[in-house]
Amino acid sequence: MSIREVIMDYLENSSKKALSVEELSVALHMNKAKDYKVFVKTLASLEAEHLLNFTAKGKVELAEKEEAKVVISGIFRANAAGFGFVSIDAEEPDVFVARGQTAFALDGDEVFIEIDKNANALKGTSAEGHVVEIIRHDVHQVVGTFVALNDDEKEQTGLIGFVKSRNKKIPYRVYLENEGLIPENKAIVRVEITHYPDKEFPQTMQGLVTEIIGQADDQGIDVLEVLASMDIVSEFPKEVLDQAEAVPEEVPENEIVGRVDYRNEITFTIDGADAKDLDDAVHAKRLENGNYELGVHIADVSHYVTENSPLDKEAYERGTSVYVTDRVVPMLPERLSNGICSLNPRINRLTQSCVMEISPEGRVINYQISQSIIKTTERMTYDAVNQMIAGDEAALENYAKIADSVKIMVELHHILEAMRKRRGAIDFDTVEAKIIVNEKGLPIEIRKRTRGIAERMIESFMLEANETVATHFEAHGLPFIYRIHEQPKADRLQRFIDFAATFGMQIEGTSNGIDQKVLQAFMKKIKGQPGEMVLSTMLLRSMQQARYSENNEGHFGLAAENYTHFTSPIRRYPDLLVHRLIREIGEGKTPANILQKWEDKIPEIAEHSSHRERRAVDAEREVEKMKKAEFMEEHVGEEYEGIIASVTRFGMFIELENTIEGLVHISTLKGDYFNYQERMLALIGERSGLTFKIGQPIKIKVVKADRMTGEIDFEYLPSELDLIDKAAKAKKKPDHKGRKKSNQSLKVKSVAPKSTDKSANKSKNGRRADEKFEFDKKKKKSAKKPFYSKAAKGKFTDKKDNGKKFTDGRKKPHKRG
């Protein structure tokens, strides 16, 4: 049970009508400092939701039944189609909010909702509700394209134009008065919101231009617009740059004192050829006792970025560096990342080192985590090391000084890889796109990014260091920030198990308690099979997102009990924090007040860093989609073979060899009626038996690509690749209209849907905005009842209440069936 459920359950069953906060905390064993803070915060939340009251004497009691409302606070997550979901907390399933029931909430807003329909674990349906109040707006600025009104419209309205938001989840136009900055038509601008949509003006917002970012035809403006729309800023404040400039370019002798000296080790960096921020170096050797020594040396960024300094505050705000196709938005100024904190060859550099003694079985026997100094022997690239591993004589001769070290590293890498496989780590080996752009930022080539042994080897060493550092802090019971990856949720995993069964793949175990080794064995079984890419992707989608936390929940994907991020403090704030914790409390001899300080601070840092990471990933994906669509604009009309990557009721997404994905809309499949088989994730033609299912090869033609939306449309082309389901075709007899009956699947007519309100059913390129389909994807099958289920019982039993008005005049919506 969640904390809120525990509190409510105790009060409902208590012999006392009211208890003091202290009595309640002691009774629930939540009176220790760490738990008490969360306990009090939960009480405040329950009071705000009218589930608890505080008496005149400050005691806690349940709200009177007639006063109790099923009102919950949460974060609204909008869908571009107009509906959304409210996230309550990590332990509770999301609540579906239909289009028209959002009270004009925007994506990210904190809201109060009332529950209209409880979740049904047996049917696998989510709870449904409606927004009753917006507590706090999350969106304060909008970035988009300015569209000027003509002179007549300006005179009639007193407005100069409107801005179309780059964010698809903000469907409203933002109108501008003749104040502040006046942009030219089609300019890309940033607008401060001054008025949000409401009942009087339900389809519009109003604002003032605070920045003219550029013109639509400026070079690189497309990427800049995406970054600006997500509040990702390249420029650093002056005080931050000033602090960076004050950092010396060389390491003075007095800063070496007290550090472990690894300058005599054969230590080198291995990075991409175009990398400039070289923040990690490695050394490896075989010991006389038969074990291996692996040293992972990371730039000591925390030595220069001190706590609460301008550099630190800016790094915290950014959270992470953002990597898009043609640029990097760094977390720290280049003066640091490419200068004193870059482990350039043959130069003294301050580091934090994790040096491990590892057995031939891959077990860490001993380790030392220390402040250190190194002087790297070489600056190596992945390509050069891969050539050495492949036995290239020229490469081996050019880098003879490190050749023995590389050989030992390869041995150790294979040992560590085998160790992780034995314990159940899952290797998804996902395929990434490499987008090549010209000097104008235009995409000229897109191909799969390759990973050789060198790339895997460095990743393997970084994993080992991260795990060792986390294990150290866990063993000493110190406050820490962990990188956690929780076990998959049962409902999502069950959908994958069902899906794999359609490929004839049986997965042992149950969705409630599956072991990593089972999934690892499954990945090994599908290796090299036709459906490998699709099945691997679907399994990855069934996993939870990794995140940062002050609580150690382990890492499911790595099958690791302890894990953190230690190896990239130049580009990730949690790594910088880990370095700071090593420096300040890592030895375990720390005053209680310092430990308490970090116990209080780490939860907020973890949550903020997770949010910033998701923002960076969203930006990177958005730019990638845009550049892929821009690339395909030059290939409209061309034909390709691809693989069906996913199937929905409105069509299917096809992935090409170079990772580009496009939609074949259901309305373009002519001459048959197609049934959508949700369990199989397939479309099957009633008359022809023509079948489209995930993993199937298919031939297509590119018919449209839109760089602004990032959407690409394909047209299906009949070919010898097609699959005919003869059994499906034969088992149904035609009715009087010549159609075959089906009670087991959803019938989807292969013509464009008709609607008097086109915007309600389609997006700009004709994609169906089907909220029920999207809702079905969010179904929860957990047997656990939501915490509000008791309060919800009987709330809507009075049929006379159906017409009850809210304070804003809206009628309460009828329950969905």
From Swiss-Prot:
Residue intervals of the RNB domain: 259-584
Stretches with biased composition (Basic residues): 729-742
EC id: 3.1.13.1
Major subcellular site: cytoplasm
GO annotations of cellular component type: cytosol
InterPro entries for the chain: CSD2, NA-bd_OB-fold, RNase_B_OB_dom, RNase_II/R, RNase_II/R_CS, RNase_II/RNase_R, RNase_R, RNR_Ribonuclease
Catalysed transformations (reactions): Exonucleolytic cleavage in the 3'- to 5'-direction to yield nucleoside 5'-phosphates
Domain of life (superkingdom): Bacteria
Ranges for region Disordered: 728-817
Claim: Protease is one of the keywords in the record: no
Assigned keywords, A-Z: Cytoplasm, Exonuclease, Hydrolase, Nuclease, RNA-binding
Compositional bias annotation for Basic and acidic residues: 767-777, 795-810
Major enzyme class: hydrolase
Gene Ontology MF terms: exoribonuclease II activity; RNA binding
Domain S1 motif, chain residue ranges per copy: 637-717
A Pfam family reported for this protein in Swiss-Prot or TrEMBL: CSD2
Segments crossing the lipid bilayer: none
Location of this chain's protein in the cell: Cytoplasm
Any GO BP annotation: mRNA catabolic process
HAMAP family hit by this protein: RNase_R
Family: Belongs to the RNR ribonuclease family. RNase R subfamily.
Biological role stated in the UniProt entry: 3'-5' exoribonuclease that releases 5'-nucleoside monophosphates and is involved in maturation of structured RNAs.
The protein's name in its UniProt record: Ribonuclease R 1
This protein's encoding gene: rnr1
